Amino acid sequence: MNPMTSTILLMTIMSGTSIVLMSSHWFMTWLGFEMNMMAIIPILMKNYNPRSMEAATKYFLTQATASMILVLAIIINLMHSGQWTITITENITASTLITIALVMKLGLAPFHFWVPEVTQGVSLSSGLILLTWQKIAPLSLLYQIYPSINTNLLLTMSLLSIMIGGWGGLNQTQLRKIMAYSSIAHMGWMIVIMIYNPNLSLLNLFIYIMMTSSMFMLLIANSATSTSSLSQSWNINPTITTMMMATLLSLGGLPPLTGFAPKWMIIQELTKNNSVILPTLMAILALLNLFFYMRLTYSTALTMFPTMNNMKLMWQFQPTSMTPMMTMLISISTLALPLTPLFISLS
């Protein structure tokens, strides 16, 4: 793809998300979502093969359906309240439809089926945008309307997402699908705390974006797309492989890494609100995620496929391609647990 075209499309994606973040008017919010969707589709198709075309089509159909439901909800809300303001969402039907539309855009269960398929069909760089930046706008809108959301509906979807995100990733060998199921599970953790402490949900989103961006950058640096390619990465680049192992364990929420902090704070907040069964179930289901991250870590660092003798020396002659941005992201993703008191004060 032409660099100028890529720049224009990325600027349009950022503009669409910014419009959603800054708007208090339903029409401008819908416009921001549409700008965002129309700009990312060419980025998903940049490899231009049948798989990326199929992935882009699935993404378009899902997002277009969600936008139609959102417009219907906006019209119903306008008929009852006479207001275009986002925070005035008094009608139960409109509120439920808006929640369903935003959950479809986020890829939460039971509307999660498009996420693994689309992520698997696109390149690693497109998957990075899809699983990080594209989550910001729907979550910011949920943050604004959370007082009028049906609590039981949101909690059910959250718990289902954590469950499916764990179970779905168990039998996967493709890294992009594993990251997609990981995203579904992390979204479940973010949404479950939205009702009790929305600021903590935004903090969780920030940490999730840091960890997922680090992981995708390491996969791009290693050109790894499956578990078998990870098994050969230690011979080629041990530095990046070690960092990948730490980032994977952080994504799984293993202490003393950064990924443990949001899970710790969310469970603490839920227990403060006299909820015991829900955080217990969430903690148990989080072990499913941790299991497939541990399996990936084992494939990455503790196994080696049979290789030629000269391949074992490749890392001595190949420079490690680390950028300052990647170094900063990996540091935040793995070593920020001592900053937990600061995170608690911010939430």
Swiss-Prot record:
Family matches, as InterPro entries: Complex_I_Subunit_2, NADH_DH_su2_C, NADH_UbQ_OxRdtase_chain2, ND/Mrp_TM
Pfam families: NADH_dehy_S2_C, Proton_antipo_M
GO biological process: mitochondrial electron transport, NADH to ubiquinone; mitochondrial respiratory chain complex I assembly
Reactions catalysed: a ubiquinone + NADH + 5 H(+)(in) = a ubiquinol + NAD(+) + 4 H(+)(out)
Documented EC number(s): 7.1.1.2
Key words, A-Z: Electron transport, Membrane, Mitochondrion, Mitochondrion inner membrane, NAD, Respiratory chain, Translocase, Transmembrane, Transmembrane helix, Transport, Ubiquinone
Entry keyword annotation includes Translocase: yes
Main subcellular localisation: mitochondrion
GO cellular component, one term: mitochondrial inner membrane
Membrane topology: Multi-pass membrane protein
Subcellular locations according to the entry: Mitochondrion inner membrane
GO molecular function terms attached to this record: NADH dehydrogenase (ubiquinone) activity
UniProt superkingdom: Eukaryota
Transmembrane segments: 3-23, 25-45, 59-79, 96-116, 122-142, 149-169, 178-198, 200-220, 240-260, 274-294, 326-346
Role: Core subunit of the mitochondrial membrane respiratory chain NADH dehydrogenase (Complex I) which catalyzes electron transfer from NADH through the respiratory chain, using ubiquinone as an electron acceptor. Essential for the catalytic activity and assembly of complex I.
Family stated for the protein in its record: Belongs to the complex I subunit 2 family.
Subunit: Core subunit of respiratory chain NADH dehydrogenase (Complex I) which is composed of 45 different subunits. Interacts with TMEM242.
Name of the protein in question: NADH-ubiquinone oxidoreductase chain 2
